[in-house]
Amino acid sequence: MTSDVTRLKDAFSQLRIAAAEPGAFKRRELWSAFEYRDLGVAAATGGRIGAFHMRAIGPCTGAQGWHWHALGFHMVYILKGRVTYRWEGSDRDVVAEAGACLVQPPGGAHNVIDYTADLEVLEITMPADYATIPAADLD
């Protein structure tokens, strides 16, 4: 009889190590103001989960624009710096600094209003690949 742990291990993930190598950060179309380092989680989980280390390329030059993500789970952990968000339906901005963890509800429209030039975050999503959809201007 196969244990539940063995079945889960075989079905869900593989060992992957993503070393912090020079040149590991790449720019993506999604946010040209940031560069991303793929942490190998998508490959290890067959695309079920994605994890990226994101960092700002420079200072914020203005709000990023209202948008939402077509995914089931979205977590952002602030490693360094500060970011200011605005969510649809909220009457105040949320300022998150190093050590803060944000779990965004699926389909929730939001806007990144400002961030520091040294901003670095860990982003975890389910699934790894998802669409980002522009939302109507909610300001």
What are these regions (language model features)?
Residues M1-G58, P134-D139:
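A short, N-terminal "cap"/entry segment at the start of jelly-roll beta-barrel domains
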Residues R28, G62-A70, W87, V94, ...:
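Short histidine-centered beta-strand/loop micro-motifs
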Residues I49-F52, L102-V103, T116-I133:
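A short hydrophobic beta-strand segment most commonly corresponding to one strand
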Residues H53-A56, W68-Y85, I124-P127:
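Short, conserved beta-strand element in jelly-roll/cupin
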Residues R82-T84, A109, D118:
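Structural motif
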Residues G89-G107:
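Short acidic-glycine-tyrosine-enriched beta hairpin
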